[in-house]
Amino acid sequence: MKLESLHKLWIHELKDLHSAETQILETLPRMVAAASHDELKMALAEHLQETRTHVSRLEKIFKSLDFSASGQRCKGMEGLLEEGRALLED
């Protein structure tokens, strides 16, 4: 995808960020459930709530810009979360 302006780059990066945060939302509940240490469980649960807030804010930004947040998948976060899921299975 050729980005021809700073505005298009900004929208692209916002979509990438939204995708990353949404992917985290899909995985964190399993990580919270799998955590055996109380402090880790609490930290992950707190991060889950913060991530929900991030997604909500990003969706408000997209709504105010009259753009859709969908249509892009953050490959970097996808890889990181795949590693995390593999650790949960071990």
Predicted segments with their positions:
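Amphipathic alpha-helical hairpins
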Residues: 1-90
